[in-house]
Amino acid sequence: MANPVGFRFRPTDGEIVDIYLRPKNLESNTSHVDEVISTVDICSFDPWDLPSHSRMKTRDQVWYFFGRKENKYGKGDRQIRKTKSGFWKKTGVTMDIMRKTGDREKIGEKRVLVFKNHGGSKSDWAMHEYHATFSSPNQIMTYTLCKVKFKGERREFSVATGSGIKHTHSLIPPTNNSGVLSVETEGSLFHSQESQNPSQFSGFLDVDALDRDFCNILSDDFKGFFNDDDEQSKIVSMQDDRNNHTPQKPLTGVFSDHSTDGSDSDPISATTISIQTLSTCPSFGSSNPLYQITDLQESPNSIKLVSLAQEVSKTPGTGIDNDAQGTEIGEHKLGQETIKNKRAGFFHRMIQKFVKKIHLRT
């Protein structure tokens, strides 16, 4: 039912009971009141869902409904007032409604109720529930008339009308194949929290600023923590890939020795020496000597390196293997200790920064 411009449906308490509620309960033909006020089960809907069921489309944020009276118990006058998201709570005392003309008799009662969400938090929704009273005991009241009112701002009402729709947002961030939270995902979570309006958190600027600072601390330290693990994994992978190491090419040079005694009987000769350099990651179990020195042209004054090479080559290969294996085990243990120390340091730094931020805020 569309209202003309300037039309307002604002009946008084006496008009609500005398003109609409009493005919709804007493008369057999109620079409003239049903065209104005719709009949609904009030407690089957949350208050923000009721405006869409009203026949009167108004911008006053007040809606009228007929509702069938349903007692909570077989005896007594207590009614069912529980909805899906909360309940209607009676407040104040019951007020009598008197007829303004004639004998000024009592024609009804008005009860004021407020809607409370689960948990007892009060909302901006209120309801005036009207009951008709009859002089004859044979007249039984079947219907009540409810005036539902939203006392908040219109902008808040537009949000409240959509609050019945449930939105589900996933709080589980994506992970990689190993089930570990990636650094990019971790950073995006913290940045998304920082970009939100502080009023959406707690409403207190100091607490929200502290929350954002803590997120920044976590973001920086988590990135450094994961980077340290990446570097450690690279070191371990290098240690595990020793057999694929290619030895360096031999170095060839010319060494000349000039005699200091000035004798011409022993001519000065040049010695060409080929040296195979020692690799940092030798191939274990190899029978080849670590150093191979070849004297291409012997001379009394040439550099004596052959004996040194022979002594080195006489060293058993098993001893080298055992030492190398021991070194590898020691490096692996050292890597594990490094990871533990970095993790402990990460949590220590995070707690220190957070405590420092708390002191600055307070």
From Swiss-Prot:
PROSITE patterns: NAC. Residues 107-157 bind DNA. It comes from the Eukaryota. It is found in: Nucleus. Keywords: DNA-binding, Nucleus, Transcription, Transcription regulation. Residues 3-151 form the NAC domain. Transmembrane segments: none annotated. Gene3D superfamilies: NAC domain (2.170.150.80). One of its GO terms (molecular function) is DNA binding. The keyword tRNA-binding does not apply. Residues 240-266 are annotated as: Disordered. GO terms for biological process: xylem development. One of its GO terms (cellular component) is plasma membrane. Coiled coil: none annotated. Pfam families: NAM (PF02365). The NAC domain includes a DNA-binding domain and a dimerization domain. This is NAC domain-containing protein 5. It comes from Arabidopsis thaliana. The gene is NAC005.
